[in-house]
Amino acid sequence: MSDFKAILAKLADGKSLSRDEAVAAFDHLMSGEATPSQIGGALMAMRVRGETVDEITGAVSTMRAKMLRVTAPDDAVDVVGTGGDGSGSVNVSTCAAFIVAGAGVPVAKHGNRAMSSKSGAADVLASLGVNIELTPEQVGACIAKAGIGFMFAPAHHPAIRHVGPTRKELGTRTIFNLLGPLSNPAGVKRQMIGVFAKHWVEPVAQVLKNLGATAAWVVHGSDGLDEITLTGPTYVTELANGVTRSFTVTPEDGGLATVANADLRGGDATANAAALAAVLNGVKNDYRDVALLNAGAALVVAGKAHDLKEGVALGIKSLDSGAAADKLAQLVAVSRA
């Protein structure tokens, strides 16, 4: 791409790319034709200046154009965190996904192996017996039959492999940490996204609005968690009816208590899988409560609950009735069929 030098020169001068320039730039970066120097230079220039809403919107458009799609119902939701919050916590959004599915909302969960924690969504689900190496058609069948399916990011975003080695060598967060959660292969229009820093809450909601999302909550816990936290307030930007608004929520808004020193420490995939299964099977602890808060918000985004308190109440019903645990059993069975 001869124009790429012009794009790099623009980035080197500290200038921002337009949405169309970002589409073209990321098309080149993910084409297999970009050199490691070009990839590293572009990613670091954006990172140092701070990526803009237009750049992220353009990059996501390119990611979505190149991804292998999954068929899912129009009302499907995703509950996902960017990761990279450095907390090494249990898998909150993965647990919340089963609670949401148990409440009757189809879930198209997008995720990957661990980035900064010891165990990502893919690691935990594999440890629970879910077959994560599925074709897009098989994932679609999981969503249709079990009400929940897991899309393993590398299988649906093959173009990402071209930037993988450079990202690893850079060893720092780049725009790609934000692109994954925004590039759900099932094209869900309703999302609950946790981000690793407060300053990303509003811009990510704006990107979702630009790309035609119906409803979303983008959240960041005041303790640094890329989820709604149990330890204090959480910053939220909500997208509803084409309008974004920002506010904070506390556990009390969901009918739960703030726990100053919530024990959400995670271990390896086996330990985190056991902790997740325990919550689905009725154990009451901090992990259950934080999963309920996040599931409650996802149920608001799904249009199933009017507010966080009602969402949490529906989540409790999903757990206590055994419906959430049934969803895990069904996903294991269908994914291995």
From Swiss-Prot:
Its cofactor is Mg(2+). SUPFAM superfamilies: Nucleoside phosphorylase/phosphoribosyltransferase catalytic domain, Nucleoside phosphorylase/phosphoribosyltransferase N-terminal domain. Keywords: Amino-acid biosynthesis, Aromatic amino acid biosynthesis, Glycosyltransferase, Magnesium, Metal-binding, Transferase, Tryptophan biosynthesis. Mg(2+) 1 binds at S93, E227. GO terms for molecular function: anthranilate phosphoribosyltransferase activity; magnesium ion binding. 5-phospho-alpha-D-ribose 1-diphosphate binds at residues 81, 84-85, 89, 91-94, 109-117, 121. It is an enzyme of class 2 (transferase). Mg(2+) 2 binds at D226, E227. Belongs to the anthranilate phosphoribosyltransferase family. Homodimer. This is Anthranilate phosphoribosyltransferase. It comes from Afipia carboxidovorans (strain ATCC 49405 / DSM 1227 / KCTC 32145 / OM5) (Oligotropha carboxidovorans). The gene is trpD.
